[in-house]
């Protein structure tokens, strides 16, 4: 089911899709993505696809993944930290050899700028009212309710789509500020918001981020917990679908939270979920890690 096959079909009206499938961190694992779509019997004229970010990097075929996703009709995509890293590299805001990556094919592609333009118009949060679900890459910090989270994510979308997106991206990296304050302004405000939605794993009850720890939930530093353990499912009243945290292996201890990163780029598996039925589907990794 490649991009050409989808492009050859008449674009479907997906306002009322038969099924909505959300896929975990693809990270350039194009072969596994296609195998997963075969497993779920995805029909682009009847079903809708969504992705919880980290579309690229670590796996071998990031370029193919981006071209395929761009060909889809109205995919539900949110950005992850690796996608933001690609934007920074792609626009020449950081030397290509600053970190190890597998993005060389994207950076050298003739349609690079077109792909980057498409990517930076993707949001950090998607709220699907009809399915009572929120898609986000890393999670939602405890000090914000769903409405506040959506509004803060829109601040990042405005920066990415606006005329000063290069300045925003150039100054995006960093762990500070790690504590949210309502009076944060400028790049500090945007950096905290972006880190919360794309990098957070552990935090405290007030949303102080620990961006250094990456282990399992029982390895949290003192006073910190996994972000989802601070949230109130009754207050949220939605399913929160997220990726980013491969160490969870797709397991979340909190009600109505669905972890989808099952470490495909690390040699494990790629996982998706049917948002209506909550049925999960997985395929094993076939691609050797390239970094």
Swiss-Prot record:
GO terms for molecular function: bis(5'-nucleosyl)-tetraphosphatase (symmetrical) activity. InterPro entries: ApaH, Calcineurin-like_PHP_ApaH, Metallo-depent_PP-like. Its EC number is 3.6.1.41. CDD domains: MPP_ApaH. It is an enzyme of class 3 (hydrolase). The keyword Iron-sulfur does not apply. It catalyses: P(1),P(4)-bis(5'-adenosyl) tetraphosphate + H2O = 2 ADP + 2 H(+). Belongs to the Ap4A hydrolase family. Hydrolyzes diadenosine 5',5'''-P1,P4-tetraphosphate to yield ADP. This is Bis(5'-nucleosyl)-tetraphosphatase, symmetrical.
């Amino acid at each position: 089911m490649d991009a050409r096959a989808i492009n050859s079909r008449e674009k479907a009206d997906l306002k009322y899709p038969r099924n909505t499938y959300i896929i975990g961190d693809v990270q350039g694992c194009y072969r596994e993505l296609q195998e997963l779509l075969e497993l779920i019997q995805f029909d682009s004229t009847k079903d809708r696809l969504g992705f919880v970010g980290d579309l690229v990097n670590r796996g071998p075929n990031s370029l193919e993944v981006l071209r395929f996703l761009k060909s889809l009709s109205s995919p539900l995509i949110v950005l992850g930290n690796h996608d933001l890293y690609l934007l920074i590299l792609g626009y020449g805001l950081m030397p290509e050899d600053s970190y190890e990556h597998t993005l060389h094919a994207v950076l050298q592609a003739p349609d690079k700028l077109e792909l980057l333009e498409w990517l930076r118009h993707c949001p950090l949060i998607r709220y699907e009212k009809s399915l009572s679900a929120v898609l986000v890459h890393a999670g939602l910090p405890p000090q914000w309710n769903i409405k506040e989270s959506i509004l803060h994510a829109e601040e990042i979308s405005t920066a990415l789509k606006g005329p000063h997106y290069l300045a925003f991206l150039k100054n995006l990296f960093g762990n500070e500020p790690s504590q949210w304050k309502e009076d944060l302004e400028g790049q500090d405000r945007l950096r905290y918001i972006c880190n919360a939605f794309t990098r957070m794993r552990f935090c405290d009850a007030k949303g102080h981020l620990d961006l250094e720890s990456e282990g399992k939930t029982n390895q949290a530093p003192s006073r910190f917990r996994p972000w989802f353990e601070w949230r109130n499912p009754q207050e949220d009243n939605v399913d929160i679908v997220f990726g980013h945290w491969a160490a969870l292996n797709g397991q979340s201890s909190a009600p109505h939270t669905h972890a989808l990163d099952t470490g495909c780029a690390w040699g494990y598996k790629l996982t998706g979920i049917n948002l209506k039925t909550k049925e999960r589907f997985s395929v094993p990794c076939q691609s050797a890690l390239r970094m």
